[in-house]
Amino acid sequence: MGHIINPISYRLYNIRYWNNNWFSGSLNYSYLINQDILIDRFFRKFLTTHLDSTNAGIIFVNLKIIRSFNNISLYVYIHDSFLDLLFFNLKKNARFLLIKRLFNKKFYKKYRKALRQNKQLKQGLFMLLKKRVILRYSRKLFFLFIKNKILKIYWESFKTLSLFYLKRFSRSSFLSKIFIIGLSKMNVNANIISEFFFIRLTQYYTIWEVLRNINFLFKSLMKKRKLVKGYKITCSGRFSRKQRTTYSWKAFGSLAFSTVKSKLDYSYKTIALKYSSCTIKVWVRLGKKKSNLVDFVV
């Protein structure tokens, strides 16, 4: 009998590598994980709310974090549907320069004002800056984040703990470098397809209409350019006001789950709709092309 295996973790150190390249001891490990969660969650909400990414055609794909001594360098991977440019030419584009400027304004200035207003909160949280206190708050926040991830109550009910961690980002020199890399239309990634599902379902499209568009896109990539060898998409949830949950799937081509050398990309996402929450799983088998940027990103 076969077992269900995550295709990314099964192929680590053979084809794929970790997305966040850093290591630390047992004291600061849980604290640094929470920093990565806050940065990743900020970028996802920043593109959807402030930039109107559904109308502009920008989709957040992935974020890569590399740490050095008291510095962080961020690599933000963005898919732009209107532009078909290479990653080294995106510095000339004004759209991607706005993301850097708005990041410095929203992320730093917004939370500094909140900390200045809550002086009593600062005295209660920042009187003791020992390692034991930091670890106690970080473990509690990490547990509550996993518990309430689907309901999206994190930013509303746990403001005291979020302000405690955002104080650590108060120095502008802490985030030394921010690189914004745009993926063109030739690049294929499972995260792009899951975000495309999220945009279409919020715009009241049916599932079969979305699956037809994706099937038409993959067939053009498989026949002409041979960038994709196969794919599989599964959806489960209450769609179109049905009382029971439905399970729908679509597959085409070949998918080799057991072989280690096959380049597989996987994504799992939960979407909160009006009636219920639905789940989406995407498997994509990539072709043999050296210039594909997705091969270097988990």
Swiss-Prot record:
GO terms for biological process, alphabetical: translation
One Pfam family cited in the UniProt record for this chain: Ribosomal_S3_C
This protein's record includes keyword Oxidoreductase: no
Cystine crosslinks: none
Ranges in a coiled coil: none
Compartments, record wording: Mitochondrion
Record-given protein name: Small ribosomal subunit protein uS3m
The species this protein was found in: Acanthamoeba castellanii
